[in-house]
């Protein structure tokens, strides 16, 4: 199947999934966040769990949503003893966000779903207090309204503080992404 959307069908996640595998980079990115020991963090697409393990050490509760069956099974095995992990085998776009309570989001987004996921997070009745999202540079700039405002940037900016906090190297991922630069965008509720 082509990576392009076909008549309302979404491409499979694997067509745009690049796993963040550099442990040094994961540590660098996590140090730049405001994640604390008492936080509840929702991780979208934990993949092989490279970041999940660090989130479990750093935060009170981690809820991870993984759509891929093989990756989900691997996560179940890898984190079988983790008491502060709630793991869901589900499509995040169909998963219900918490109706109440504070939570933060950390995600290495599949590039073809960035807009859909960002829309779900920002249009929720109980949006995250912060979201740390790894996305393609061009998408991040569009959400920031650079070089010019877009409808999406105009809708997001009044309620959320957006910014780029880290530029990745392609070598930080496997497989290496085909896009020029990957970055981590911070979205904070005003």
Per-segment meaning from a language model:
Residues 1-190:
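Catalytic cores of RNA-modifying enzymes
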């Amino acid at each position: 199947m082509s990576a392009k959307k076909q008549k309302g069908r979404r491409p499979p996640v694997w067509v745009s999934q690049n796993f963040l595998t550099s442990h040094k980079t994961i540590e660098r990115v996590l140090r730049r966040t405001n994640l604390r020991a008492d936080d509840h963090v929702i991780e979208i697409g934990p993949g092989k769990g490279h970041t999940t393990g660090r989130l479990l050490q750093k935060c009170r509760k981690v809820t991870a949503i993984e759509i891929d069956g093989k990756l989900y099974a691997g996560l179940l095995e890898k984190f079988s003893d983790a008491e502060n992990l709630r793991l869901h085998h589900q499509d995040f776009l169909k998963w219900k966000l918490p109706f109440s309570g504070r939570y933060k989001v950390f995600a290495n987004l599949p590039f073809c779903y960035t807009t859909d996921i960002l829309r779900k997070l920002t249009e929720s009745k109980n949006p995250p207090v912060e979201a740390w999202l790894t996305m393609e540079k061009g998408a991040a700039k569009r959400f920031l309204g650079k070089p010019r405002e877009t409808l999406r940037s105009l809708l997001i900016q009044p309620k959320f503080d957006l910014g780029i906090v880290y530029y990745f190297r392609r070598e930080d991922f496997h497989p290496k992404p085909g896009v020029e630069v990957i970055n981590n965008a911070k979205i904070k509720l005003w």
